[in-house]
Amino acid sequence: MITEIRFETTESGVLRPNQERVHDVRITRDGQIVHVILSTKEAAGRGMRHIRDEYQIGPGTAAAFLDSLTADFGIDEWPMDFGSPVLEGRTYEITIRHDDGTVRRSRGTVDLPPGGEALRNAVIGLAAFKRKPWIF
């Protein structure tokens, strides 16, 4: 049984001031959703700015979503790599944790996994996100 999924999406390319670079979204079976955004600082600033928003949804809703990953999206059959060579653009890594301690990862760049658009919409529909998360 899936206990948690994490979507980490990273923007590559030239660094610019005030630019979002990473979105990290975690959804747990107990209904916790954490959305972390890393972005560059102002033009004179060094380092990254870290924004963390947390949301709580019903455990039943969270469990139904996590169960749908296998039943509706076939996530357990995804290959480990959907990548295509790119120099700029987004890359993503999905980490899936199971109750038996196993961890499964898939990553990609340009090519979305099967049902990727529908999965993105399902995640975005789980909570009233303050900032729209990058999912893929």
Where are these regions (language model features)?
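Short, flexible N-terminal segments of the mature chain
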Residues: 19-40
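Short, flexible, solvent-exposed loop/turn segments with mixed acidic/basic and small polar residues
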Residues: 41-45
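Short, well-ordered, aromatic-rich surface patches in folded extracellular/luminal domains
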Residues: 1-23, 47-61, 68-136
